[in-house]
Structures are given as structure tokens and as C-alpha cells.
Design a protein with these regions (language model features):
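Beta-sandwich strand segments
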Residues: 371-375, 440-451
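Short beta-strand and strand-turn-strand segments in soluble, beta-rich domains
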Residues: 340-341, 381-383, 389-405, 448
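Short, surface-exposed loop/turn segments at beta-strand-coil junctions that are enriched for proline
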Residues: 420-428
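N-terminal [4Fe-4S]-dependent radical SAM core
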Residues: 2-15, 50-103
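Short acidic, flexible loop segments centered on an aromatic residue
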Residues: 368-395, 435-437
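Radical SAM enzyme [4Fe-4S]-AdoMet core and its adjacent flexible, acidic
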Residues: 1-47, 51, 105, 129, ...
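Asparagine-centered strand-capping/turn motif at beta-strand->loop junctions
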Residues: 363-367
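Conserved alpha-helical substructure of the radical SAM core
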Residues: 37-40, 80-207, 222, 234
Length: 459
């Protein structure tokens, strides 16, 4: 378990970007506050989200963190400890009028009891809220105020969001009024019917995660107590089927599977891989945990050979890694200079300072899924990227240049791309590192895909 909560000198970026709306109308500053102990304001008595975001409590919190810590944060695990004598990052107290990201908690209640979880019904979490369900009018008020400037809404916090009888209405409201907002939710998949899952697929929501920890009922229910594996899988399948039927590229569908001692055998993990592929989910990932103490997987502890084998399939290791066979994106990138002959001897790329240079490349899709060249929601489209590095490999500019794929690149196929970039203004020796990037998600290298690096001589 992370010991960040023990830090007395720390930093944190959340108060500059994010707020969490609890189901009773109070606003807290982070998603790791199950019992609502760090309240910034209460929208039942305060007029606007902005009045909370720019208010004295939030402003003082930013001042304190800018000085190296705040008592307000208490045991929050989101704290990032500072090293001895390390100065805290300098950020202005003025964080703008509104946050750029918002979590919305519909309810703290849940329809199952996850073994020893901090939000299980037995913990009394619902008694820490002053209302059982989020008021719909309060919801629309908050979304109407913040929507124009939000980049993302996470439609969940503690509890199961879709227990709220108007949860699907809320999802549809957000996407109808603020289609630019990236809308994400996480669910156990048990609170709606198959028709509800299909409605969710049609809502325009950008990404949905189903948490299903097992490939059979007997192992699944060990952690998701009172859960129904068959129902969760049926709803997951209905969501994926409706996405296929409508022909859209959203929602992106994740199956997240926490590894425990009772569900981490190869046969069960392979069954999950096959099921995910058959259902048609976009991504299956394993989650590594260190609790409950008597349940977490010892087999996949970081540093073990088994962990290394699935490292690129782990939920928070890479946002592109995928346990479905062939679904992790991999590419081969061949790079020439001004002609294909340059590739024969690995000749350096040469340019004139401040002048454009055209670089010929060949990109081959080594995975089993196509690389999309376009996306309706501006994410997960794939482009070729060039990262500028010093001669010793030190990164100078990760986003130095991009080039579009001419069209979606099918599995096993190759495309020629000419990238035009401007040479640095200062002559010298550099290096260019080429990789593909899933825009808004991650570089392919983070999921284990090979990159290509070329010397870059600028005269």
C-alpha cells in the first residue's frame, strides 16, 4: 500500500484542476476521500461552483501546498511526497474561475459488497453523506455552469452510479449539452438491464469501464460479494453489441480485472482473454493491488517473472496495454533521410538550421487491430511522432512533430509517410526518436512497441 498519506512535506496538482461533487451537493478536492472529510464547499448553500473553486478554503489550500503541504489534506493518499530540500512546484493561487475536470457521484450506495473495500456498505459510507442520491436539478445546475470549460467528467466516485434512477438521463444530458466534454464512467455493470446497457452505448459517452474480477461466478463473487457474473457479462456484451450495431467509435469499452489469489491462475486469465475477444470489448487489463491482505495476488507482485510477463497488460502501467491477444498496439518504423538509400547504412538525417526537411518513413502495423487515422471524439487516432533529443539522448521536445496516417492502417499492412519538420534553429548534433502515438492516450513505446532513433545533424 502506498505510504504517501504519511507525507508531511508534499505537493499535489488536484486543487488546480479537479473537483469532486458528492451526492449530497458538497464539493471535495480529490477522488480519494471516501468519507467526505476534505470539504471545500456545499452547493446547497453556496451559489455556484465558481464560488467554491475561487473561495477562501480552496485558495488557502493552494497557498499551503505551494509552501510544501497542508493540514487540510490529512491522510489523503493523493499526496506526492517531496524529497529532502526539494522545493514545491510553483503554481499561482489563482487557478481560474472553474475546474477543468469534474467527478460526479450519483450515490455512495452500492448493490454489492466488495470484500474489505473502503466503500463497501458495511463501512457505513452512506452515513457520511447527507443525501442518498444526487438531486437532478443540482446536477444540471452544476453541469450547466461548468460544462463550457470542462475537458472531462468522470461519472462515478464511490458507490454504483447507475443505481440512481436518472443516471442514464444524466449521461445523455451531458453529451447532448456539452459534446466536447470527454465523459467516462466505471461500473460493476449490475445496476441496469441489457436495454439500459444499449442505451448507454447510444448516449455518446466516450469511455466505459466494467469491473469484473474473474472469468467464472465462483471466483468473481469472492471479491464482488453478492455479485452476478453472468449478468455483468451479459450487460458488457450488450454494450459492445450495440456499439457494433450503431457503427460508432464510442464508447471505448474496458474490462478491468483485479488479480487476487483466487483468480490469477493461467486458465482463468486465458478464459477472460478469450471472453473479452469474443464479446468485442476494446481493452482487457489486469489491475495489481496490495489489499485485502489475505486476498491480493502474490504471483504478480512487481519484480516477479510473472509480473514482467504481463507488465504491458496492467491497467495503470500503460493506457494502451491490452491482455486481449494481438490487441496491444505494436509497430515497426523505418526511417530514411531525403531518400530511401539513406536507410541502407543507417545514415544520419541532415538538415539546415531553421529550415524544413522532409523525412521518408515506412510504418508497419505489427498488431492484430487496425490503427485508426481519425476519431469522432479526437482521441485514440494514431499519428507518427518525432521526438527531438540531444546527442546524448536527453529528451528536448517530446512533441516535436507529428504526421497523419493517410488512412486507417490495417493489421499487418505497411504505409509510407513523409514527415515534414523544421530543423532546430541552433546548429549541432541531435537525435530524432520516432514512435506512434495514440492521441490523448499514450505513446506506443509505453506498451512495449519498438521505436526508431536516428542521428540528426543540423548545419
Amino acid at each position: 500500500m502506498s505510504l504517501n498519506f504519511l507525507a508531511t512535506r508534499f505537493t499535489c496538482s488536484w486543487p488546480w484542476s479537479t473537483m469532486v461533487l458528492l451526492c449530497d451537493g458538497r464539493l471535495v478536492c480529490g477522488c480519494a476521500d471516501p468519507y467526505g472529510k476534505r470539504v471545500l464547499g456545499d452547493l446547497r448553500v453556496m451559489p455556484t461552483v465558481s464560488s467554491v473553486w475561487t473561495g477562501e478554503i480552496a485558495s488557502q489550500l493552494r497557498r499551503d501546498i505551494g509552501s510544501g503541504g497542508s493540514k487540510f489534506c490529512g491522510d489523503c493518499p493523493l499526496k506526492l511526497p517531496l524529497k529532502k530540500d526539494e522545493p514545491p512546484p510553483h503554481r499561482p493561487v489563482d487557478a481560474g474561475v472553474l475546474p477543468s475536470r469534474l467527478y460526479i457521484e450519483c450515490t455512495a450506495a452500492c448493490n454489492i459488497s466488495c470484500n474489505q473495500a473502503c466503500c463497501a456498505p458495511e463501512t457505513g459510507i452512506t452515513r457520511t453523506r447527507q443525501a442518498g442520491m444526487l438531486d437532478y436539478d443540482l446536477f444540471t445546475r452544476v453541469v450547466d455552469e461548468t460544462g463550457p470549460t470542462l475537458g472531462r467528467i468522470d461519472f462515478f466516485n464511490y458507490g454504483e452510479a447507475f443505481l440512481h434512477k436518472r443516471a442514464l438521463d444524466m449521461v445523455e444530458y451531458i453529451k447532448a449539452h456539452f459534446p466536447h466534454v470527454y465523459l467516462y464512467t466505471s461500473t460493476n455493470g449490475l445496476a441496469f438491464s441489457e436495454d439500459g446497457a444499449r442505451r448507454l452505448a447510444r448516449s455518446g459517452i466516450d469511455e466505459v469501464t466494467f469491473s469484473i474480477d474473474g472469468a467464472r461466478q465462483d471466483s468473481y463473487v469472492r471479491y464482488r460479494q453478492r455479485g452476478d457474473f453472468s449478468k455483468a457479462i451479459r450487460n458488457l456484451a450488450a454494450l459492445a453489441d450495440e456499439k457494433r450495431r450503431t457503427g460508432g467509435d464510442v464508447p471505448f469499452i474496458n474490462w478491468r480485472y483485479i488479480l487476487f489469489t483466487h483468480n490469477d491462475a493461467d486458465d482463468e486469465m486465458d478464459l477472460a482473454r478469450r471472453s473479452a475477444a469474443e464479446i468485442g470489448v476494446d481493452r482487457l487489463c489486469w489491475e495489481i493491488t496490495d489489499h485485502p491482505e489475505d486476498m491480493f495476488s502474490r504471483r504478480f507482485v512487481p519484480g516477479t517473472a510473472d509480473y514482467a510477463r504481463i507488465e504491458n497488460e496492467i491497467w495503470d502501467k500503460s493506457y494502451l496495454g491490452n491482455a486481449i491477444p494481438g490487441a496491444t498496439p505494436r509497430a515497426r518504423i523505418e526511417v530514411g533521410g531525403s531518400s530511401w538509400l539513406d536507410r541502407i547504412g543507417n545514415a544520419p538525417i541532415k538538415g539546415i538550421s531553421g529550415q524544413p526537411i522532409a523525412i521518408s518513413t515506412r510504418v508497419t502495423n505489427l498488431s492484430a487491430r487496425p490503427f485508426p487515422a481519425r476519431a469522432s471524439y479526437g482521441r485514440r487516432l494514431v499519428r507518427l511522432g518525432a521526438q527531438l533529443c540531444a546527442a546524448d539522448g536527453t529528451l528536448i521536445d517530446r512533441d516535436y512533430e507529428r504526421a497523419w496516417l493517410p488512412s486507417s492502417l490495417p493489421a499487418g499492412k505497411t504505409v509510407e509517410i513523409v514527415m515534414t519538420l523544421k530543423a532546430p534553429d541552433s546548429p549541432g548534433r541531435y537525435r530524432l526518436k520516432f514512435d506512434l502515438v495514440s492521441e490523448g492516450i499514450d505513446w506506443f513505446e509505453q506498451a512495449g512497441s519498438p521505436t526508431t532513433t536516428k542521428d540528426f545533424i543540423v548545419g
